[in-house]
């Protein structure tokens, strides 16, 4: 008898209760260590446990495959508008993977619209028949975004199972009543006068350093994303966590030798979060199986990076607790002190673990959003000299001297704000948002099965001809057109999402981005680098909207 046969026989001999429990554990989208420990405590050890676990895993794969194929074969969405039936195994996976971000649905929408039909969504499948809907109808988007967010169970939960393994149970990931508790505690810190004061005193100083570096290296090719990420990283460190990343020193080092690339930020939080997000075949396989939590048990490298990340975030929390100087207080300090009147005394404040998870969450979400927004704003200025001059005229009108622009002045610049809104429309940092149907739904006469993944393609909605006049044209003036604005659906412009779960940091991002862009545009004429001439920009999306190749510019100091 070979080993495989012996293992199978041993597995068949073990308790049916174990197998039932094991399949129940693996098949749920919420499976985690609690269920795993429960199984391991059922009394089996040695070869029996190994054989049973192996058999259980095989059974899970077979039954999941059969269930997925049945859903795929008899799905009510097979005849819905979209890409039509594809391979069960691959679906549209490779088309979406290989094409620029959102290009397949944009092309599909153009073809379907020629028939004059109303297209409320585009249906498609990915690996192993997994159902997806790209929502295009603003009423449907409103329905999803405005569904009550603080109830258990939620009507349209997020189920960000992979992100949860890296950032933990922060505000972006938690669901239902637990999300409501977090939001009530955290939100006052982002609406406080403290935040505006902190932005006003922190950002101009960091931008002054950037301007000085660019003046010293005028005419040199600048990697836009890398340089702006330096600024926004230091901002979120100081304002949100009272933490010094000291990233800006890399700009000064680069100025001494601009032919070299920027160095890496020497901080354990940054290095460990990059390692935790790195891709691997194991990560892809576990994501497909909807069991990403297993990675920390199967991958020593991921386990190490996650432990280092948690340790670095824990240290930031503890250091913030020890701050006595009022001038060094941060958003994190306000979150530590905040209380929720609707929770019990034992639950009315965030625990140290919850604070740690919020640190990781705000670093990933806040840092990327602002740097991406500023990045695309400067790209537009480099490619549209006519708009650059209009922005410059608005800036000099409100800031005629050579002083650094502060937030109070930037708030008065109406054309600048229209320009930045138009940048958000065509180059929204958040390109896509996901939800999942908790139960069967009816969308515009189509039956939507429970467990269907809903994709809200902000990048596509902001370019949809049903919602925008001349959608591909970059026109800041449209934001002064009150008639056009009054006709536009309120959910046609959603750069920070909408409803109860909108981005809590949008005020933070808006204040910071305005100061950065205004000061750069005031001090420099911005041009695309010669290396960019003749190259086509294609979009990609990971955390925020990126592109290939990376944008490079050069600047010429004004007057």
Curated annotation (Swiss-Prot):
Localization in the cell: Membrane
E.C. designation(s): 1.14.14.-
Main localisation: membrane
Keywords: Heme, Iron, Membrane, Metal-binding, Monooxygenase, Oxidoreductase, Transmembrane, Transmembrane helix
Annotated residues for binding of heme: 503
Keyword Ribonucleoprotein listed: no
UniProt xrefs under InterPro entries: Cyt_P450 (IPR001128), Cyt_P450_E_grp-I (IPR002401), Cyt_P450_sf (IPR036396), Cytochrome_P450_Monoox (IPR050196)
Gene of this entry: dabD
GO biological process, one term: cellular response to carbon dioxide
Name listed for the protein in its UniProt record: N-geranyl-L-glutamate oxidase
Catalytic reaction equation(s): N-geranyl-L-glutamate + reduced [NADPH--hemoprotein reductase] + O2 = N-(8'-hydroxygeranyl)-L-glutamate + oxidized [NADPH--hemoprotein reductase] + H2O + H(+); N-(8'-hydroxygeranyl)-L-glutamate + reduced [NADPH--hemoprotein reductase] + O2 = N-(8'-oxogeranyl)-L-glutamate + oxidized [NADPH--hemoprotein reductase] + 2 H2O + H(+); N-(8'-oxogeranyl)-L-glutamate + reduced [NADPH--hemoprotein reductase] + O2 = N-(7'-carboxy-7'-demethylgeranyl)-L-glutamate + oxidized [NADPH--hemoprotein reductase] + H2O + 2 H(+)
A Gene Ontology term for the protein's cellular component: membrane
């Amino acid at each position: 008898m070979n080993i495989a046969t012996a293992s199978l026989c041993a597995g068949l001999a073990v308790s049916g209760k174990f197998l039932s429990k094991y399949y129940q554990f693996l098949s749920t989208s919420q499976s985690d260590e609690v269920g795993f420990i429960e199984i391991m405590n059922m009394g089996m050890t040695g070869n029996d446990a190994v054989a049973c676990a192996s058999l259980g895993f095989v059974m899970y794969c077979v039954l999941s495959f059969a269930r997925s194929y049945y859903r795929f074969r008899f799905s009510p969405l097979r005849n819905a508008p979209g890409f039509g039936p594809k391979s069960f195994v691959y679906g549209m996976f490779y088309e979406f993977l290989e094409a620029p971000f959102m290009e397949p649905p944009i092309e599909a929408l153009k073809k379907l619209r020629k028939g004059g039909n109303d297209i409320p969504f585009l249906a498609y499948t990915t690996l192993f028949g997994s159902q997806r809907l790209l929502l295009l109808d603003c009423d449907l988007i409103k329905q999803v975004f405005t569904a009550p967010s603080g109830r258990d169970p939620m009507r349209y939960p997020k189920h960000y199972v992979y992100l949860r393994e890296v950032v933990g149970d922060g505000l972006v990931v938690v669901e239902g009543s637990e999300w409501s508790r977090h939001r009530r505690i955290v939100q006052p810190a982002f609406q406080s006068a403290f935040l505006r004061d902190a932005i006003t005193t922190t950002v101009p100083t960091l931008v002054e350093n950037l301007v000085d570096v660019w003046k010293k290296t005028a005419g040199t090719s600048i990697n836009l994303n890398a340089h702006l990420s330096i600024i926004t990283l230091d901002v979120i460190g100081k304002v949100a966590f009272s933490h010094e990343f000291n990233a800006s020193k890399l700009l000064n080092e680069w100025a001494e030798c601009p032919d070299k690339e920027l160095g890496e930020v020497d901080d354990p939080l940054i290095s460990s979060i990059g390692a935790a997000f790195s891709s691997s075949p194991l990560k892809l396989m576990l994501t497909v199986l909807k069991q990403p939590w297993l990675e920390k048990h199967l991958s020593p490298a991921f386990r190490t990076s996650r432990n280092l990340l948690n340790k670095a975030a824990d240290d930031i929390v503890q250091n913030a607790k020890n701050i006595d100087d009022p001038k060094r207080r941060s958003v994190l300090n306000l979150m530590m002190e905040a209380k929720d009147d609707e929770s019990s005394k034992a639950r009315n404040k965030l625990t140290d673990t919850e604070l740690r998870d919020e640190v990781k969450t705000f670093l990933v979400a806040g840092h990327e959003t602002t740097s991406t927004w500023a990045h695309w704003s400067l790209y537009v200025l480099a490619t549209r000299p006519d708009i650059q001059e209009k922005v410059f005229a608005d800036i000099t009108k409100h800031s005629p001297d050579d002083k650094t622009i502060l937030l109070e002045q930037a708030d008065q610049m109406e054309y600048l704000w229209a320009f930045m809104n138009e940048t958000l429309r065509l180059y929204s940092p958040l390109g896509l948002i996901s939800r999942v149907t908790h139960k069967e739904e009816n969308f515009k006469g189509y039956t939507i099965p429970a467990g269907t993944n809903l994709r809200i393609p902000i990048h596509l909605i902001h370019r949809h001809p049903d919602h925008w006049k001349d959608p591909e044209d970059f026109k800041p003036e449209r934001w002064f057109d009150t008639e056009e604005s009054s006709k536009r659906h309120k959910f046609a412009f959603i750069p920070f999402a909408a409803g109860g779960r909108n981005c809590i940091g949008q005020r933070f991002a808006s204040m910071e981005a305005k100061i950065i862009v205004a000061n750069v545009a005031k001090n420099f004429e911005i041009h695309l680098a010669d290396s960019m001439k003749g190259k086509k920009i294609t979009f990609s999306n990971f955390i925020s909207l990126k592109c290939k190749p990376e944008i490079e510019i050069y600047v010429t100091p004004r007057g």
